[in-house]
Amino acid sequence: KADNEAFLAGKAAEEGVLALDNGVVIRKLEQGRGKVHPAPGSVVYVNYTGRLMDGTVFDSTDGQALPALFRVRDLIMGWQIALVRMHEGDKFRVWIPAKYAYGSAKMDMIPAWSTLEFDIELVKIAQI
């Protein structure tokens, strides 16, 4: 847990990031052209890659023919926090503390209490 906190503190101190009070850290990689943000009830198309702190990829849409489709409120809280700040076409790198990811639960390749890193591209808001 201390490693996670030190990792996030290091990311929060980097230039050009948005470090939120809840511990989520966001870096905008690309600016999209969209004008609206998705709401918690919105359905969105996204491309993403999820990594552990050591860089191990545990999930990705790379190589898939279509982006993934999700309702924002059905995602882990860290994703919800990031997505409602995005516009269509935006690409963010988001560091999510364990409490806004899977917490004490172990999920497949993700150990309990893991800080996660996601590259998220909001391709389209299908339903606001």
Please provide the spans of the model-predicted regions.
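Cross-family detector of peptidyl-prolyl cis-trans isomerase
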Residues: 1-128
